[in-house]
Amino acid sequence: MTPKQIYKFVATGEAITWALLISTLVLRALGDPIPVGVLVAGSIHGAMFLSYCASAVIVGVNQRWRFGRVAGAVSLAIVPFATLPFDRRLERSQALEGNWRTEASSDPRDANWFDRLFRWFIARPWLLMLAVVGILAALFTTLLHLGPPTEWFD
């Protein structure tokens, strides 16, 4: 899969899970007899949110986005559906075009340690996926332990 395909797949999933979570919140407010729906939808959305953030960072590094663009992608995921206009802008500016950077190019940035490490992982997608899933699982577990975001500062 190309960076564009991965980003679009995860971005679409993030928007769909926002809709799922908001729907279950509305049902709960209307007296839903199955209140576990919010827990399930929230967990699914939380996992997809973390996946979106990880894919935005990985694709952003690969495509050499400025830090502000990567930070924008991640922070806009906090607001329901705010990633949709951002994603359209990425499409229009062709910021998602190109293949994975698995080999060094003539770009001087390819000589630094971070780009070499990044290319090493990108050239080993199963290892990268295993590392990302491990990190996201640890983060997801920590967030589950902390409880809903509305209770973090009580």
Feature names for model-found ranges:
Residues 115-136:
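Individual transmembrane alpha-helices with interfacial aromatic-anchor signatures
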Residues 84-103:
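Membrane-water interface of transmembrane alpha-helices
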Residues 71-89:
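Hydrophobic, aromatic-rich membrane-embedded alpha-helical segments
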Residues 97-122:
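Membrane-interfacial, low-structure loops and terminal tails that flank and connect transmembrane helices
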Residues 2-9, 33-40, 65-68:
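Membrane-interfacial loop-to-transmembrane-helix junctions in polytopic alpha-helical membrane proteins
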Residues 138-154:
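Juxtamembrane boundary at the C-terminal end of a transmembrane helix
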Residues 34-49, 154:
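Loop-to-helix transition at the N-terminal end of transmembrane alpha-helices
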Residues 12-26, 46-57, 81:
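Hydrophobic alpha-helical transmembrane segments of multipass integral membrane proteins
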